[in-house]
Curated annotation (Swiss-Prot):
Official protein name in the record: Mitochondrial import receptor subunit TOM40 homolog
Biased amino acid composition, Low complexity: 51-69
Record's GO cellular component terms: cytosol; mitochondria-associated endoplasmic reticulum membrane contact site; mitochondrial inner membrane; mitochondrial membrane; mitochondrial outer membrane; mitochondrial outer membrane translocase complex; mitochondrion; pore complex
Organism: Mus musculus (Mouse)
Subcellular location: Mitochondrion outer membrane
Gene name in the database record: Tomm40
Top-level taxonomic group: Eukaryota
Annotated stretches, region: Disordered: 1-73
Main location: mitochondrion
Upper taxonomic lineage: Eukaryota, Metazoa, Chordata, Craniata, Vertebrata
């Protein structure tokens, strides 16, 4: 839901995905160990004291369907999660590209406050330094959730990304995000999300300007129809001088046993994903994207291999453009170190990128 801020400027760079969601603020720095940084659209968690329905997961869907069949009632439907999270389960399996050398140092100053230092050196992109701050408040909703959450990140040029997330009531969560480019104020947005027992509704307002008459409004709604099926939609309205438009898309999510299938269909194209948990160690995903604007389609396959006893995590992917990628993360106990290796090969363009990362803390 937070992908609306860049719609006020013409698109640049590679073609956007076929979903009507627009590009938003860069993601905040990762939360430190022991800290909780829930996204605005994140689930309230099964351990939450909110009393709302828990978000549907592949494992929970099977048990929910079995329980419904036993008592013959369909009245207790699970919360379907949020619209923007429909494809997240599959996308998390794909490796993230990293080029050059990256060093990250996490330092906890207290149980609720941490700072992060990140240095990135690259041969293609510019080298940079980022300073991040994470604060978790005292409003404890569950053993893993506390509010408010404040996150800030500033680079060596003075550009700032900041977010504030707060749980206003058991079902209502809000977020405010701002972005500056050096000394210039660039973007800001306000989000509100309400979670019912079997539905989720959310609204985002980005870059409103009453004097100029411009802004972006995004509305999401996702409703559980059965313990396994959820349907919903997204409406994006944008306005600026001399231009006004609306984009609408529909989504469906089906969760059963250990797999999850999701499809989003709209004016911009179609986006479909399939997630399958083969075992506790292996997860696989397939993604298909079709863009009506770019007249282009692509398909991707990704998998994740997790070996907790060996402190080993591997992700690999290949797509229809013949781009092969892989990342490897290896924790080095008893030291608080995590080693990361990344490699991507584009067979069509004959290009190869690799990266090395080290996280301390």
């Amino acid at each position: 839901m937070g992908n609306v801020l860049a719609a006020s400027s013409p698109p640049a760079g590679p073609p956007p995905p076929p979903t009507p969601s627009l590009v938003g603020l860069p993601p905040p720095p990762p939360s430190p160990p022991g800290f909780t940084l829930p996204p605005l659209g994140g689930g309230l968690g099964t351990g939450s004291s909110t009393g709302r329905g828990s978000e549907r997961t592949p494992g929970a869907a099977a048990s929910g369907a079995a329980a419904a069949s036993e008592d013959g009632s369909c009245g207790c439907l699970p919360n379907p999660g949020t619209f923007e999270e429909c494809h997240r389960k599959c996308k998390e399996l794909f490796p993230v590209q990293m080029e050059g050398v990256k060093l990250t140092v996490n330092k906890g100053l207290s149980n609720r406050f941490q700072v992060t230092h990140t240095v990135a050196l690259g041969t293609i992109g510019e080298s940079n330094y980022h300073f991040g701050v994470t604060y978790v408040g005292t409003k404890q909703l569950s053993p893993t959730e506390a509010f408010p959450v404040l996150v800030g990140d500033m680079d060596n040029s003075g550009s700032l990304n900041a977010q504030v997330i707060h749980q206003l009531s058991p079902g209502l969560r809000s977020k405010m995000a701002i972005q500056t480019q050096q000394s210039k104020f660039v973007n800001w947005q306000v989000d509100g999300e309400y979670r019912g027992s079997d539905f989720t509704a959310a609204v985002t307002l980005g870059n409103p300007d009453v004097l100029v008459g411009s802004g972006i409004l995004v509305a999401h709604y996702l409703q559980s129809i059965t313990p396994c099926l959820a349907l919903g939609g997204e409406l994006v309205y944008h306005r600026r001088p001399g231009e006004e438009g609306t984009v609408m898309s529909l989504a469906g999510k089906y969760t059963l046993n250990n797999w999850l299938a999701t499809v989003t269909l709209g004016q911009a194209g179609m986006h479909a994903t399939y997630y399958h948990k083969a075992s506790d160690q292996l997860q696989v995903g397939v993604e298909f994207e079709a863009s009506t604007r770019m007249q282009d389609t692509s398909a991707s396959f990704g998998y994740q291999l997790d070996l907790p006893k060996a402190n080993f995590l591997f992700k690999g992917s290949v797509n229809s453009n013949w781009i092969v990628g892989a990342t490897l993360e290896k924790k080095l106990p008893p030291l608080p170190l995590t080693l990361s290796l990344c490699a991507f090969l584009n067979h069509r363009k004959n290009k190869f990128l690799c990266g090395f990362g080290l996280t301390i803390g």
